[in-house]
Amino acid sequence: MKFVDEVSIRVKAGDGGNGCMSFRREKFIENGGPNGGDGGDGGSVYMIADENLNTLVDYRYTRHHEAQRGSNGGSTDCTGKKGEDLFLRVPVGTTVIDASTQEVIGDLVTPGQKLMVAQGGWHGLGNTRFKSSTNRAPRQTTPGKPGEQRDLKMEMKVLADVGLLGLPNAGKSTFIRSVSAAKPKVADYPFTTLVPNLGVVSVDRWKSFVIADIPGLIEGASEGAGLGIRFLKHLARTRVLLHLVDIAPLDESSPADAAEVIVNELTRFSPSLAERERWLVLNKADMVMDDERDERVQEVIDRLEWEGPVYVISAISKQGTDKLSHDLMRYLEDRADRLANDPAYAEELADLDQRIEDEARAQLQALDDARTLRRTGVKSVHDIGDDDGWDDDFEDDEDGPEIIYVRD
């Protein structure tokens, strides 16, 4: 299945139905009064968070969505039928943005959550509405109001408690396979992981948390190297980050250099995301001798001037993974308790979350504008005319805002 986490669509709410001009005409009632009914309201467009969806691929090929128009009013004071609302189902974790103003319309973060994105047009009035003591036979009606039309950008972020980041082949996918039932592809070449993978880590029968594995970063990712930094947005809503470092790389490169690359790329993407609680996890400890392992671990700690938690593990042999999982669960529980009981801490985290969202969105918008400039010479997608920015030749639109990878 294709994994799409960003799409642009146009939604149009239904227009309101027109009011009717009609007069009562029956036998023996030659001059009956007005009886024209009102039109029906136009249908609105809603988005609903569906926990069974994990991609926005359906909206890549169908970009125009329109709700039903309200019916016109009828004679004998018949009111027109309301247009049917249009419900668009999207994955949980989808942010809906007005493409013209960059205003966030809403976040769909809970299953079943509903968000109106386009208001249906108001119904027109029939001539009955204009009857008065001085105007017994009004010939005045009003047309229905047009439904709201919007160009929207939808961004999906996976919802997870813990996020993994590191260079390609740092062992992120092996780690998530080790601690959960998820089975992401594992191989001995870079960029084995092309899309985010989620796994549920069960610490005991009643306690669990969700962990997210994203494609690896390389030096220069913020300038587009490798798979770029777009996938870092999926870490924006995590509660803690695990920075995995391979201390036994096959190319005999420096683990300290590798760790420093990740910190630099993370900071370039979002300085606030770099402030998120982050634990250092040094992987593949079973592949080096104890003395050499300790030396490499200390080198990484010294290079990063690290003062946070440090774990030395082997994901493939599950050495140290149980302790790490239990410590993560304990941290998440303590964090939840503190959020509930410490308003100042809750406010501090809310401010951090908002800064992360704003910085991530600004970074992604800058990448989109740069790509648009390369393709069209237009400085920003917002400078494109009303219909000029809509290219229905999807197969050739390789540089659009949608990012597509194939999930094996």
UniProtKB/Swiss-Prot annotation:
Location of the protein in the cell: Cytoplasm
CC annotations in GO: cytoplasm
Major place of residence: cytoplasm
Sorted UniProt keywords: Cytoplasm, GTP-binding, Hydrolase, Magnesium, Metal-binding, Nucleotide-binding
Pfam family of the protein (one): MMR_HSR1
EC number, UniProt record: 3.6.5.-
PANTHER family for this protein: DEVELOPMENTALLY REGULATED GTP-BINDING PROTEIN-RELATED (PTHR11702), MITOCHONDRIAL RIBOSOME-ASSOCIATED GTPASE 2 (PTHR11702:SF31)
Family designation: Belongs to the TRAFAC class OBG-HflX-like GTPase superfamily. OBG GTPase family.
Matching NCBIfam families: Obg_CgtA, PRK12297.1, PRK12299.1
Protein name: GTPase Obg
Source organism of this protein record: Pseudomonas putida (strain ATCC 47054 / DSM 6125 / CFBP 8728 / NCIMB 11950 / KT2440)
